[in-house]
Amino acid sequence: MTKKKSHKPGSATIALNKRARHEYFIEDEIEAGLSLQGWEVKSLRAGKANISDSYVIMRDGEAYLFGATITPLNVASTHVVCDPTRTRKLLLKQRELANLYGQINRDGYTVVALSLYWKNAWCKIKIGVAKGKKDHDKRDTIKDREWKLDKARIMKNANR
C-alpha cells in the first residue's frame, strides 16, 4: 500500500482580514471557491495576498470578490498582463447565491472577506454576511477584551 502524503509544513491560511471582525458583526460564514489565473495561484502559494479592504458584490446573479490584492511575482511572464486588483468570480452553488442575495438585501448588511486559505489543492475564501458596528459597539468590544486580560492577570496573581 502507498503511504498517505503528508501536507506541507506551515499554515494553510494565506491571508486574514482581522479588521472585519473589529468593524462588523459577522452573522453568517460561507466557504466559496475562487476563479483564479495561473499567475495568481503562484502568488498565493508565495503568500502575496491582501484581503483587508475586500468585499463581495452581486452582479448578474453571480458573486464577485472586489478589492482583494494579489501581488504578482517578479518572475511572472511578460506576455501575461497581471492586474493585482481585478474582480474575481466566486464559485458558489445557485442555492448559496440565492441565500446570500436574500441576506444582503436587508438594510445595513454587506458581505466581507474573512480569510483566504488552501483546502487540499484548492484556494478557498471564507466570506461573512456582516452588519457594521457603531463606534460604541467597537468600544464595548475593546473593553470586554481588556477586561478578559485583566481578569486572567488577577487570577494568575491570586493563585500564587
From Swiss-Prot:
Q: What domain of life does the native source organism fall in?
A: Bacteria
Location, primary (coarse class): cytoplasm
| Protein name per Swiss-Prot or TrEMBL | SsrA-binding protein
**Key word RNA-binding present in the record?**
yes
Write the record's keywords in alphabetical order, separated by commas. Answer: Cytoplasm, RNA-binding
GO cellular component annotations of the record: cytosol
The gene coding this protein: smpB
Any one Gene Ontology molecular-function term assigned to this protein's record = RNA binding
- Protein localization: Cytoplasm
The protein's job, in short, is: Required for rescue of stalled ribosomes mediated by trans-translation. Binds to transfer-messenger RNA (tmRNA), required for stable association of tmRNA with ribosomes. tmRNA and SmpB together mimic tRNA shape, replacing the anticodon stem-loop with SmpB. tmRNA is encoded by the ssrA gene; the 2 termini fold to resemble tRNA(Ala) and it encodes a 'tag peptide', a short internal open reading frame. During trans-translation Ala-aminoacylated tmRNA acts like a tRNA, entering the A-site of stalled ribosomes, displacing the stalled mRNA.
Into which family does the record put it? Answer: Belongs to the SmpB family.
Entry annotated with the keyword Cytoplasm: yes
Q: Which GO terms describe its biological process?
A: trans-translation
